[in-house]
Design a protein with these regions (language model features):
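Proline-centric
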Residues: 12-17, 108-116, 149-168, 202-204
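A short glycine-rich beta-alpha junction/loop motif
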Residues: 3-7, 100-105, 141-165
């Protein structure tokens, strides 16, 4: 059963109501692995989404568990149910920067056919989903730093889905915003480095 809702703000030209669905009704779990794969080893961070593990660690810390790593394909999604200050109820991202990636088997991975994966990740990182997860996961329910939430529990949340054209438009907009943020962050870091160098040379 589904309900429909209309968002308070949206792009001009879209008038249809958004459909409320259970996440589990529109996604399919992914558990595939390939011990022989040479795909990059990646992980999810709350700030930046998918990054290569080598960007965070100087060595491969997967060890023997690497054989169990899930092989994710471009356009598929993963939910990292590790709590962080930025995202206390975990974070979900679509793989967009590589054709394939090997990712920790503790992540909940899934495909969302007929949906825009980037749009899905935007919604699944939103405040409404966090509120729903708060009711599912006790703040004390932790195991090895992970929120104790199963795939079925995670996909029991409700999502609001517009048509695919509107999903594409929203995903494009937020991708552009993210690119602008990254660009300005790099410019800021560059200016901070210049300032530091000038201060060091002026006051010697």
């Amino acid at each position: 059963m589904s309900k429909t809702e209309i968002p308070s703000i949206r792009f001009r030209g879209f008038d249809d109501a958004w459909e409320q669905r259970k996440l589990g009704d529109v996604v399919k779990e992914i558990t595939r692995n390939d011990p022989e794969s040479e795909a990059p080893i990646m992980m999810i961070t709350a700030n930046n989404g998918f990054i290569e593990q080598s960007e965070r660690y100087a060595f491969n810390n997967a060890g023997e568990s690497l054989k169990k790593y899930i092989l994710l394909k471009k356009g598929e999604l993963a939910y990292n149910h590790g709590a962080s200050k930025l995202r206390p109820y975990g974070s979900c991202f679509a793989l967009t920067t590589a054709e394939n990636a090997r990712i920790p088997f503790v992540y909940h991975c899934f495909s969302a056919e007929n949906q825009n994966a980037e749009f899905m990740s935007i919604e699944l990182n939103g405040a409404d989903i966090e509120n729903q997860l708060r009711k599912i996961v006790s703040s004390g329910a932790r195991m090895d730093g992970l929120l104790n939430i199963s795939f079925d529990e995670y996909t029991s949340v409700s999502v609001l889905l517009p048509g695919t054209e509107e999903q594409d438009r929203i995903a494009d907009f937020f991708r552009h915003l993210d690119n602008l943020i990254t660009l300005h962050q790099r410019e800021l870091e560059k200016l901070q480095s210049i300032k530091k160098a000038l201060l060091e040379k002026m006051f010697v």
